[in-house]
Amino acid sequence: MPRLFKIYAKNYFLTYPNCSLSKEEALSQLKKLETPTNKKYIKVCKELHENGEPHLHVLIQFEGKYQCKNQRFFDLVSPNRSAHFHPNIQAAKSSTDVKTYVEKDGNFIDFGVSQIDGRSARGGQQSANDAYAEALNSGSKSEALNILKEKAPKDYILQFHNLSSNLDRIFSPPLEVYVSPFLSSSFNQVPDELEEWVAENVVYSAARPWRPISIVIEGDSRTGKTMWARSLGPHNYLCGHLDLSPKVYSNDAWYNVIDDVDPHYLKHFKEFMGAQRDWQSNTKYGKPIQIKGGIPTIFLCNPGPTSSYREYLDEEKNISLKNWALKNATFVTLYEPLFASINQGPTQDSQEETNKA
């Protein structure tokens, strides 16, 4: 009695000998196969053997173990002629090894997200690597920590601080892109000196001066400072408290906006105002953060001893800092709003009131 065909595995390695299909056509057909377990990743490689025959090698990674009882299930069909291509089907003991083999000639195409495998057929099972691979594939920091707590308890206890910090970086969500409710053209009473500063300094990196000039804008609340500053392009917005973590601060921004921060307590005063490059910020509970820098900063403030940068720099103890600041920043005082109220919607006041700019 013939032996029944059955493979139960999470990773499948398929080889199609003498297969004339393109890798794109093969991938398209494999993606359409209906399985009870989701396909997380497919890699298709085309290889020419020494005799000139084309072969296809395929790695398929499923979300969970998939049981295949039909040895014709993975057959491919030629779209141009009545030809079927039947593969050799194996369970991949190490998807890492198979993936390396499939990629060796560089002629491949893939779909989905490759799942990390801690095992290697050459090195045997590595339980610690398996645990970390499973954690990386989990999709979130909390799930990853739970996996490591269960499967790598020693590391969980002794290295929790490092694990937590590293997983924050690995699973950090993409920064939300701020969309201004107003176009910069909505601000129709912007002084010429502000317009000129923007034209020279708020530009993409290739057009930006090596050491751009920052600007300090002082004025009463509800003059449109914040909304105008945030309408100019991709920026980092720091209000009240400076958070330079990757969750908030982007090294790809065109400029910074520092809003309503008392200059007496502004950390990295010179780094921001001087558009300095490649500097570090020490965090209280984490590793130092590397800031690429080289971008200008817009400082927004109200008049008064705890807000005004002019008043702060006029203090006798800050005379040398003032001399430096005058070479690195433009100082502008607003006496009128940057907009004509007839052109602004009702959100202007509410936003300005929130930021107290």
Curated annotation (Swiss-Prot):
Compartments, as annotated in UniProt: Host nucleus
CRESS-DNA virus Rep endonuclease domain boundaries: 6-114
Cofactor: how bound: Divalent metal cations, possibly Mg(2+) or Mn(2+).
Names of required cofactors: Mg(2+); Mn(2+)
GO cellular component, one term: host cell nucleus
PROSITE patterns: CRESS_DNA_REP
Ranges spanned by the short sequence motif RCR-3, renumbered to the chain: 101-104
Gene Ontology terms, MF aspect: ATP binding; DNA binding; endodeoxyribonuclease activity, producing 5'-phosphomonoesters; helicase activity; metal ion binding; nucleotidyltransferase activity; structural molecule activity
Residues annotated as catalytic: Y101 (for dna cleavage activity)
EC number assigned by the record: 2.7.7.-, 3.1.21.-
Chain residue ranges for the region called Oligomerization: 154-174
Renumbered ranges of motif RCR-1: 13-16
InterPro entries: CRESS_DNA_REP, Gemini_AL1_CLV, Gemini_AL1_REP, Gemini_AL1_REP_central
Binding sites annotated in the UniProt record for a divalent metal cation: E47, H55, H57, D105
UniProt keyword Nucleotide-binding, yes or no: yes
Binding-site residues for ATP, renumbered to this chain: G219, D220, S221, R222, T223, G224, K225, T226
A GO biological process held by the record: DNA replication
Similarity comment: Belongs to the geminiviridae Rep protein family.
Domains (record comment): There are 3 rolling circle replication (RCR) motifs. RCR-2 is probably involved in metal coordination. RCR-3 is required for phosphodiester bond cleavage for initiation of RCR.
Annotated function: Essential for the replication of viral ssDNA. The closed circular ssDNA genome is first converted to a superhelical dsDNA. Rep binds a specific region at the genome origin of replication. It introduces an endonucleolytic nick within the conserved sequence 5'-TAATATTAC-3' in the intergenic region of the genome present in all geminiviruses, thereby initiating the rolling circle replication (RCR). Following cleavage, binds covalently to the 5'-phosphate of DNA as a tyrosyl ester. The cleavage gives rise to a free 3'-OH that serves as a primer for the cellular DNA polymerase.
Quaternary data: Homooligomer. Interacts with the replication enhancer protein (REn). Interacts with host retinoblastoma-related protein 1 (RBR1), and may thereby induce the transcription of host replicative enzymes even if the cell is not dividing anymore. Interacts with host PCNA. Interacts with host SCE1 protein.
Name of the protein described by the UniProt record: Replication-associated protein
